[in-house]
Amino acid sequence: MLTRRQATSIFGATALASIGGLDVVPSRARAADPTPADLAMPGPLGDVWLGSQDAKCTIIEYASMTCSHCAAFHRDTWPKLKATYIDTGKVHFTLREFPLDPLAAAGFMLARCAGDDKYYAMIDLLFDKQNDWAFVKKPVDALAALTKQAGFTQKSFEECLKNQEIRAGVEAVRSRAGTILGVDATPTFFINGKRYDGEMSFEAMDKIIAPIVNS
């Protein structure tokens, strides 16, 4: 069992309390849209892509697992976006980690440990059940119970969260996004290199994507 002391050393004390829906980090001057080369560079763990790499439209989302706006996007917009544009090969999509707190980092670590083929299934599960683990008195215990639905055992859960290589990889993506790409809030989207901040409806995204894919 992961003791409270061990959990604190992994996540930090903040993650063991009830964590609110933080969705911003300390503000800085808004950066210009990044260069294609800067935006294309993956983190140490690599990107997990969905859709066709030959698509005319590429979307990169930066999200945090404890961000309520991110969860709302994945609940309300993501299913239709995926069915309409990603599954049909019109959009190439990846989600990159931008954890706003240690518990969010833990969620991303578990998604990485699930493997590339189950990465988005884990992301969807954690967003769908966000209120059941992110904002409760014992979030680590709740997270452990939830991930059993994805095939984790208590042992594999603990081993994943002690994996410093994965932890460092997740944090590297967040750090680079903040310093190089100017990301300072979640969710943040880059659609063909142009930045859009905040939760987006399908209708808002459709107005941007449709002219690109139909050109």
Predicted regions and their residues:
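Hydrophobic h-region of N-terminal signal peptides that target proteins for export
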Residues: 16-20
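C-terminal cap of thioredoxin/glutaredoxin-like
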Residues: 2-6, 32, 64, 145-215
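Mature N-terminal segment immediately following signal peptide/propeptide cleavage
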Residues: 50, 56-64, 68
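N-terminal secretory signal peptides and thylakoid transit peptides that target proteins
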Residues: 1-15
